[in-house]
Curated annotation (Swiss-Prot):
This is PWWP domain-containing DNA repair factor 3A. Residues 383-444 form the PWWP domain. Belongs to the PWWP3A family. The keyword DNA repair applies. Residues 203-220 have a biased composition (Basic and acidic residues).
Length: 682
């Protein structure tokens, strides 16, 4: 544990991957047990901690996969979003470090000829102990044909990554291995001293060979390595000009062991049998009971045996239950024949080159990141989602899903605008017309919207970004519409609301709220939805009528006005009137109906005539201004206090605030201003 460079330690409440910086040995009571302290640094963080060597584990890829699976199975995030992202980024860095170390390990690179076997490859000792000395293998048979070289795959995947051993080490191994780290140049020497003895295989390996065949079938990565190694071997053979000789790699075995050791002995589909310690090709009758007869070549000969790459073959179908991963090559000419170019071999070499290039492309592909770091676009639409929607002639625009009707496959959405009403109903559209906000076409949709509405779409994106940032840091928890209506979004909303006259938004959702006109069939008449008038103004007028009746008919404010004129009650309105020298051209009257305002002003004029001697000298000179600046506010405040049963201060504050306008009234007023501005520009 103390030799590991990367460990898995507990920090806080989680297991974090860390890098070992230093090791410190401490004295323990028991001298036989040594205790170490490790100074480690959390990956992707600058946090450095000290842990005991007994409390850590060597970092392995399986640890990262188990943690990722555990995080994916959790329904709720145990920490804040920012801490969760930091933790997952640390896991990602740890996984990259492990993959990089695997790619740079000695077993992942080919070993040059002549380099001795590494000490770390002692795992083959139990297999090499079963090997006995024997004559060197031969390359040619009795009939001048090439002999098959069948190499059994090794037990584990790391065996397939070991390099080809030199000739002195061949006696210590059970079989030759052709993989991505194996070269065939050594076996392609073609010494004539090896042309006198038959090919012999190991004893007692038939059962283990079958097991390895199944293992190879379950792991396609081994097949990929074998294919790559075979392609490299072909290139070496061609470079040495051995077009008329066959290369067969096998460990030397005594003849007495060959029959029991033959991997394909007793198995249908093999084209070679053992006879008197040698291997001979099957006859036509014997071959008719085994593998199908080979197709005749165009030049009258027989096709060479198939080259088997794992479970895939090049040029012919594989023999059933044949040794997967073994390499079978046949000479195209005998010892006395003249070497001539084989038209089929050129096709096969082209196939090998294409296969080799495909394998290299597969190995060079970037590794897919873990699931926890990938964004998966949701398949369905939920309430509160941010989407794109195209409305009429305008480009796609961001919107919020307010409600979803699964049975009708429709959703009610609300476009994001500068004067958006979060409580608005929105428009109903088909789910097929919606696109997720983070879809693949997001940048294209943004560019299209910026062509005509650059400032407006920029503000929408800023609003959405601010909402997501506040969700991530935990300063806000809720839907987008709740965020828009809350005070926390005011800084972003203020930037566009202050410039509402200068920012042009598309006229979205102004037509039929059920379906856009773009979906209707040509020439089909669709009834227009009747928009009800705004009732807010009428409700305020009815409430103000009670104030007018209290002032005019009941004369409830007359005693209050006389007390102010006689200076028995203080009045801020009278004090402001006497101290101000400017003429106010616009004032807030609180009463919105002109008839109600005229009725109250006419009554106050009568009060001034009755109290002519009590009106201040300044008020006598400008009686209309005195009535509007002093008597009208005092009369309305007194009426509000009496009708609504509140004190004078509360009634005064309500008068100063003025009437509460609805969202539709503000929208109508803004549209009127825009129309007036456009009319003046023309």
């Amino acid at each position: 544990m103390t030799d590991a460079k990367y460990v898995l330690c507990r920090w806080g409440k989680r297991l974090w991957p860390a890098k070992v910086l230093a090791r410190t040995e401490t004295s323990a009571k028991n001298k036989k047990k040594k205790e170490f302290f490790l100074d480690v640094q959390i990956l992707s963080l600058k946090e450095k901690i000290q842990v005991k060597s007994s409390a850590v584990e060597a970092l392995q890829k399986s640890h990262i996969e188990n943690i990722a699976a555990f995080l994916a199975s959790q329904n709720e995030v145990p920490a804040t979003p920012l801490e969760e992202l930091t933790y997952r980024r640390s896991l990602r860095v740890a996984l990259d470090v492990l993959n990089e170390r695997t790619s740079l390990s000695p077993e992942s690179h080919p070993i040059e000829d002549g380099i001795t076997l590494s000490q770390k490859e002692k795992t083959d000792a139990d297999v090499a102990s079963q090997v006995s000395s024997a004559p060197s293998p031969s390359l040619l048979g009795e009939d001048g044909q090439a002999v098959v070289a069948q190499c059994a795959s090794k037990r584990r995947s790391e065996y397939s990554s070991k390099s080809l051993l030199p000739s002195s080490a061949l006696e210590d191994h059970l079989r030759c291995q052709v993989g991505p780290k194996t070269g065939l140049s050594e076996s392609g020497a073609g010494d004539k001293s090896q042309d006198d003895s038959g090919l012999q295989l190991d004893h007692g390996q038939e059962s283990t060979t079958k097991k390895r065949q199944r293992n190879l079938g379950e792991k396609p990565t081994r097949r990929r390595r074998s294919e790559s190694g075979l392609s490299k071997g072909e290139s070496v053979l061609k470079s040495q000009g051995q077009a008329s000789s066959c290369v067969a790699l096998a460990s030397p075995r005594p003849p007495s062991q060959t029959r029991d050791e033959e991997p394909c002995a007793g198995v249908k589909g093999c084209d070679w049998v053992k006879s008197s310690g040698n291997i001979r090709p099957l006859s036509a009758s014997e071959r008719s009971r085994g593998c199908p007869t080979k197709r005749p070549r165009l030049d009258g000969g027989q096709n060479p045996p198939t080259r088997q790459l794992g479970t895939r073959t090049v040029g012919a179908a594989p023999c059933p239950r044949s040794c997967s991963g073994e390499v079978t090559m046949l000479c195209s000419a005998g010892a006395g024949d003249k070497p001539e170019e084989d038209p089929v071999s050129s096709e096969e070499s082209t196939g090998f080159k294409s296969t080799h290039s495909l394998l290299e492309e597969e190995e060079e592909e970037e590794e897919e990141p873990p699931r926890i770091l990938l964004y998966h676009e949701p398949r369905s639409f939920e309430v509160g989602m941010l989407v794109w929607l195209k409305y009429q002639k305008y480009p796609f625009w961001p919107a919020v899903v307010k409600s979803v009707r699964r049975r009708d496959k429709k959703a009610s959405v609300l476009f994001i605008e500068g004067n958006m009403n979060p409580k608005g109903r929105g428009i109903t559209v088909s789910l097929r017309r919606l696109k997720h906000f983070d879809c693949k076409e997001k940048h294209a949709l943004l560019d299209r919207a910026k062509e005509d509405f650059a400032q407006a779409i920029g503000w929408c994106v800023s609003l959405i970004t601010d909402y997501r940032v506040r969700l991530g840091c935990g300063s806000f928890a809720g839907s987008f519409l709740e965020y828009y209506a809350a005070d926390i979004s005011y800084p972003v909303r203020k930037s566009i609301q202050q410039d509402v006259l200068g920012t042009r938004f598309p006229q979205l959702g102004k037509g039929d709220p059920e379906e856009p006109v773009g979906d209707s069939q040509l020439g089909q008449w669709r009834p227009c939805r009747k928009v009800l008038p705004d009732r807010s103004r009428a409700a305020r007028d009815r409430a103000n009528q009670k104030l007018v009746e209290y002032i005019v008919k009941a004369k409830g404010a007359e005693s209050h006005l006389r007390a102010i004129l006689h200076s028995r009650k203080p009045s801020r309105w009278l004090k402001t009137f006497l101290s101000s020298s400017q003429c106010v051209t616009c004032m807030e009257t609180y009463l919105e109906d002109e008839a109600q305002l005229d009725e109250v002003v006419e009554y106050l004029q009568g009060v001034c005539r009755d109290m002519d001697g009590q009106v201040p000298e300044r008020g006598s000179g400008d009686r209309i201004r005195f009535i509007l600046d002093v008597l009208l506010p005092e009369a309305i405040i007194c009426a509000i206090s009496a009708v609504e049963a509140v004190d004078y201060k509360t009634a005064e504050q309500k008068y100063i605030r003025g009437p509460t306008l609805s969202y539709r009234e503000k929208e109508i007023f803004d549209n009127e201003l825009l129309e007036e501005r456009n009319r003046r520009r023309r």
